[in-house]
């Protein structure tokens, strides 16, 4: 029915009962089905910082998809065309390569690594989502702590090794624990809140704390 009808930007990407969220570059919109607007992603009884660390980072994540290595190829009307200056595009791709390299270096266990090339768009979106939330929270360390810990809770996972290995092969997202343990150390606020030092396992040197947006 929709084959010759053109792009209908009012058609949803999922059913209301789907627990997920989406960015569609051809429509340049984000979709949040009703089912994701419940705990642990959104809780009406939680405070602002906790909700920002959960659903807030997801909202920021989906918006950032408009500016990842895929979404950046579409203009504001959903047309696939280059709208970047040559210099800006070169800078962006150089930073994206640093993201790939960073995640390629993450060892899950015993020589098993995250694939940074396969997951680059989602990793950029994860970083962008957290950056948005931290900008909103300002210098409030208590609020930052709540947001960090709320963010970690939404990615809590229990899975067998075989399923983990399958995800590493096919999923464009990093493993859930990587979405926490690799993202938070990229932000200076994480070090201030938890008093992280060079001796801690999650320490990343300041010059290696990649930021794109």
Regions found by a protein language model. Give the residues of each.
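Zinc-dependent metallohydrolase catalytic domains
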Residues: 1-54, 65-213
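P-loop NTPase nucleotide-binding module
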Residues: 58
């Amino acid at each position: 029915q929709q084959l010759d009808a053109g792009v209908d930007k009012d058609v949803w990407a999922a059913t209301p009962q789907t627990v997920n969220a989406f960015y569609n570059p051809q429509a340049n919109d984000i979709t949040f089905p009703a089912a994701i607007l419940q705990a642990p992603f959104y809780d009406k009884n939680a405070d602002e910082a906790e909700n920002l660390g959960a659903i807030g980072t997801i909202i920021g994540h989906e918006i950032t998809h408009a500016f990842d290595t895929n979404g950046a190829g579409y203009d504001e009307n959903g047309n696939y065309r280059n709208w970047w200056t040559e210099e800006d595009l070169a800078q962006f791709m150089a930073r994206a390569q640093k993201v790939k390299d960073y995640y390629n270096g993450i060892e899950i266990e015993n020589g098993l690594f995250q694939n940074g090339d396969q997951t680059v768009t989602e990793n950029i979106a994860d970083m962008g989502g957290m950056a948005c939330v931290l900008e909103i929270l300002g210098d409030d360390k208590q609020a930052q702590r709540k947001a960090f810990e709320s963010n970690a809770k939404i990615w809590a996972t229990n899975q067998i090794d075989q399923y983990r290995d399958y995800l590493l092969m096919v999923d464009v997202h990093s493993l859930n624990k990587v979405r926490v343990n690799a993202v938070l150390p990229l932000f200076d606020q994480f070090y201030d809140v938890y008093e992280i030092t060079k001796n801690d396992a999650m320490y990343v040197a300041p010059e290696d704390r990649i930021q794109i947006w």
